[in-house]
Amino acid sequence: MVDFEELLSKTQEVEKKKIDEELKKAFTEANLIVDEAYNEILSEYSKRIQEIISKNIEALRGEEAKLEVETKRAVNKEKDYWVQQVFQKTLDELEKIANTKDYKNRIESILSRELTEGAIVYCSNNDKKFIEGILTTKRINNVSVEVDNSIKGGVKIYYPDKKLTRDFTLKTILNQIFEDLRDDVARILFGE
């Protein structure tokens, strides 16, 4: 027969094995629970992080678009400034054109073609005597000549009976030409 101590020892071993197996099962289950909880938390926070990243990306894209528009506005404003400077410089040079023989011939041609009795010719102070000379030479009577300090060259002809003004000033002609050539001027200035 087996003595008591041996029986006790065997019983302890069997119980120890059972306890070890149950501990292993419990440890495995605990690991599964921890892994599931970890994965759940990881998934939840990953979603939140993705949402935050998406919102930030959208906000950045909005800011980028806004900055692009502001940059284009600033660039266009600067380009317009420089194109306007070219226009102004050209406008300042108009007085030199008014001293050429071609200019004088064209003014004479305009006056011969456009003047009617009772008309008023507006011109620069520099052109007044020249225009009065044309009127005398061409024997165009009953036309008055008045100085308009805003005119640098060319003439405006006012027909009081028709309440009509025809503008042949160099500034008006330059405006028309410049609008047609504005894109070309910008291309030359900015290489576009």
From Swiss-Prot:
Report keywords, A-Z.
Answer: ATP synthesis, Cell membrane, Hydrogen ion transport, Ion transport, Membrane, Transport
Record GO biological process: proton motive force-driven plasma membrane ATP synthesis
Q: Where in the cell is it found?
A: Cell membrane
Listed GO MF terms: ATP binding; proton-transporting ATP synthase activity, rotational mechanism; proton-transporting ATPase activity, rotational mechanism
User: What Gene3D superfamilies would the database entry show?
Assistant: ATP synthase, E subunit, C-terminal (3.30.2320.30)
Q: How does it sit in the bilayer?
A: Peripheral membrane protein
Q: Which HAMAP family does the annotation name?
A: ATP_synth_E_arch (MF_00311)
Name of the protein: A-type ATP synthase subunit E
In which organism is this protein found?
Sulfolobus acidocaldarius (strain ATCC 33909 / DSM 639 / JCM 8929 / NBRC 15157 / NCIMB 11770)
Name the gene that codes for it: atpE
